[in-house]
């Protein structure tokens, strides 16, 4: 029987669970210290926790529910990990180096059902949600790697932009956020965390009401319904008429800036007229809007799309700026490895399938 990951419990939940099992509440703080400060990888290493408590934890929880299957390192310091879960499923996690610190991109689902026509993540459909513990454990595995190579570095930023739709796994995603933000543990600042959604409007309202101080990014990729439906099938169910009011509510409720993710596809959504249309869509909240322009990473299975030319990227950027919309072009990481989200996982599954025949 599979045991849940110990990393899925918030400090409050762990305190409550241990108390119900007859242990003193302070044991939870001790365990958390071992997990997140000393970062041990076995329960046996928790030397100031009594034997009965350790045996109970070991019987009830896993501290290593996933194993590293593949690791790719880029010349720029980016590392892409492929982890194998207890059920054999594969997920991706990426470590990126920035001037401001180390950022980890985590996965929230095994596969994805959103079906964006340019994305490698949706090549294999969703089979299940990840638990909160499995999401946290991705960060811990990256941190353990950093500890092992002796760099004395810590993960300082987190982006929830890996495989899957985070808002389709809402409760586990929120538990994950509460674990990594806790000052008793990883203590990753809320403003150093960004969650991305393809636009599940009802969950955007819910997320706004939580007022977590976490950054929100919307994967928009088109300034009108016709084009967005063409490249993102979710727009059929949640068109801009439903999405934009949710974005308005988020901005007004939180008074926080929102990031608009916009992947540039040559001849599809990268022309000046579309930049003007995008600027108009956000003109009433442009002071709280930032557009992240993303050069396309080609995916073999999506050969219909090509990367925009540098001239078209510059024109799009300049047009947004001239129309009062703050924007930037995303700095690329890991271009010499399987950089596109879901690409490494898809290749490994194909490789395993061929080997099994």
UniProtKB/Swiss-Prot annotation:
Reaction proceeds by a ping-pong mechanism involving intermediate methylation of a conserved cysteine residue. Its EC number is 2.1.1.192. PROSITE patterns: RADICAL_SAM. HAMAP family: RNA_methyltr_RlmN. The active site is at 92 (proton acceptor), 341 (s-methylcysteine intermediate). Its cofactor is [4Fe-4S] cluster. Belongs to the radical SAM superfamily. RlmN family. One of its GO terms (cellular component) is cytoplasm. [4Fe-4S] cluster binds at residues 112, 116, 119. S-adenosyl-L-methionine binds at residues 164-165, 196, 219-221, 297. Specifically methylates position 2 of adenine 2503 in 23S rRNA and position 2 of adenine 37 in tRNAs. It catalyses: adenosine(2503) in 23S rRNA + 2 reduced [2Fe-2S]-[ferredoxin] + 2 S-adenosyl-L-methionine = 2-methyladenosine(2503) in 23S rRNA + 5'-deoxyadenosine + L-methionine + 2 oxidized [2Fe-2S]-[ferredoxin] + S-adenosyl-L-homocysteine; adenosine(37) in tRNA + 2 reduced [2Fe-2S]-[ferredoxin] + 2 S-adenosyl-L-methionine = 2-methyladenosine(37) in tRNA + 5'-deoxyadenosine + L-methionine + 2 oxidized [2Fe-2S]-[ferredoxin] + S-adenosyl-L-homocysteine. One of its GO terms (biological process) is tRNA methylation. NCBIfam families: rRNA_mod_RlmN (TIGR00048). It is found in: Cytoplasm. The gene is rlmN. Pfam families: Radical_SAM (PF04055), RlmN_N (PF21016). This is Probable dual-specificity RNA methyltransferase RlmN. Disulfide bonds join 105-341. One of its GO terms (molecular function) is 4 iron, 4 sulfur cluster binding. The keyword Manganese does not apply. It comes from Exiguobacterium sibiricum (strain DSM 17290 / CCUG 55495 / CIP 109462 / JCM 13490 / 255-15). The keyword Magnesium does not apply. Residues 98-336 form the Radical SAM core domain. Binds 1 [4Fe-4S] cluster. The cluster is coordinated with 3 cysteines and an exchangeable S-adenosyl-L-methionine. Keywords: 4Fe-4S, Cytoplasm, Disulfide bond, Iron, Iron-sulfur, Metal-binding, Methyltransferase, rRNA processing, S-adenosyl-L-methionine, Transferase, tRNA processing.
């Amino acid at each position: 029987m599979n045991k849940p990951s110990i990393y899925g419990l918030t400090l409050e939940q762990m305190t409550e669970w241990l108390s119900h099992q007859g242990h003193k509440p302070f044991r939870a703080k001790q365990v958390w210290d071992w997990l997140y400060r000393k970062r041990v990888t076995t329960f046996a290493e928790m030397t100031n926790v009594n034997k009965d408590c350790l045996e109970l934890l070991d019987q009830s929880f896993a501290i290593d529910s996933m194993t590293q299957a593949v690791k790719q390192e880029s010349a720029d310091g980016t590392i892409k990990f492929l982890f194998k879960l207890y059920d054999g499923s594969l997920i991706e996690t990426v470590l990126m180096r920035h001037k401001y610190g180390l950022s980890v991109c985590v996965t929230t689902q095994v596969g994805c059902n959103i079906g964006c026509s340019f994305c490698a993540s949706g090549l294999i459909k969703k089979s299940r949600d990840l638990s909160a513990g499995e999401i946290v454990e991705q960060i811990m595995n990256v941190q353990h790697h950093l500890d092992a190579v002796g760099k004395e570095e810590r993960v300082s930023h987190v982006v929830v932009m890996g495989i899957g739709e985070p808002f389709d796994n809402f409760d586990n995603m929120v538990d994950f956020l509460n674990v990594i933000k806790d000052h008793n543990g990883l203590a990753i600042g809320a403003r150093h965390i960004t969650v991305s959604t393809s636009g599940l409007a009802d969950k955007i309202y819910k997320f706004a009401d939580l007022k977590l101080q976490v950054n929100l990014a919307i994967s928009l990729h088109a300034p009108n319904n016709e084009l967005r439906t063409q490249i993102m099938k979710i727009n059929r169910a949640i068109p801009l008429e439903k999405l934009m009011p949710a974005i308005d509510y988020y901005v007004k409720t939180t008074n926080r800036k929102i990031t608009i993710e916009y992947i540039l596809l040559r001849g599809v959504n990268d022309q000046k007229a579309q930049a003007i249309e995008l600027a108009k869509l956000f003109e009433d909240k442009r002071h709280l809007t930032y557009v992240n322009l993303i050069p396309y990473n080609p995916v073999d299975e999506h050969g219909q799309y090509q990367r925009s030319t540098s001239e078209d990227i510059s024109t799009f950027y300049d047009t947004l700026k001239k129309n009062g919309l703050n924007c930037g072009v995303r700095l690329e990481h890991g271009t010499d490895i399987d950089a596109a989200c879901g690409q490494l996982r898809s290749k490994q599954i194909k490789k395993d399938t061929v080997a099994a025949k």
